[in-house]
Amino acid sequence: RTTMAALAAQYASAGMTLDKQEGFPYFLTVNRNAGTVTVYTLDENDQYTVPFMAMVCSGGTDTPTGYWGTPVSYPWRLLAGPCYGQYATRIWSSYLFHSVPYYSQHKDDLEYDEFNKLGTLASLGCIRLAVVDVKWIYDNCPIGTPVCIYDDAETPGPMGKPGTMYTDPADESKRGWDPTDPDPANP
């Protein structure tokens, strides 16, 4: 079981701290095993210990564990496949937070079968999220935001694992859209 104290100890062993980093209101943790992202904010001692929100995600067996600061973000990013991800934020090297893949850079061209895998190990190593969640990271987490990716099979995180939404592969009018996408054109 990984507690915040255990994460703090692991973070410290990597030469890092849970202490406030100026300009960064959030600290993101990814539990690769559980398929959850937990966003922490600052407590009264200026440490990232207060769970703020949780998101369901999909990593992969090649998703690295460790500690980084996000170096860059993109509205759309070419991914392996080739396919595309919306609201991509680089974690480290070629690993990103991004939406479930799209066949093209069009919001109605979602790989809908992949959307239905959210919450499971389904990626080639990146962290996939629903559009509403990855857009939140893109909009609210400045470049340099600290990220920790770890494994804990016993508990998804302090806020649990959120439920997932599914697309209906038979519904041709809606299946190409991420159902969480706030775009007004989303059916």
Regions picked out by a protein language model, each given a short descriptive name:
Residues 6-110, 183:
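Gly/Pro-biased beta-strand-loop elements
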Residues 1-6, 185-187:
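N-terminal secretory targeting signals
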Residues 74-187:
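Exported/periplasmic cell-wall-interacting domains
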